């Protein structure tokens, strides 16, 4: 069941992309950032990305990504109320989308951070402690004082059960 696992401990590498703030490569398949600006989506496509998962509640990427071949996905997350089910749905999108894929929110820190932490645990077999450490890494700008719920979600999730449920859902969807 772990045949699709990626490199276990590849660290996030900063990537300079025009009009894409807080951009990092987490693996050959996954990138993270803040909201891409004008021409940011074209620059991402030029970099070789195939898909974008937008985690913002009230902002759609369709206008700025127009005239690109990027596949756009959206999950409306509220940083103060992210649920286990929402993480599951995000990972199912990431696992089925053409890659590489970029995950972003407004700042690329809180919503993006929790989704990337779940990805690290489920897809790359990181420990929850290591994923939490990356979530809290000051490079990404996590707002711990506002969103302590995100660290609690990582700490309180039964990741073994989560992984089993994820694999079953993947199989059911033919991913």
Residue ranges, per PLM feature:
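Substrate/cofactor-recognition hotspot
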Residues: 108
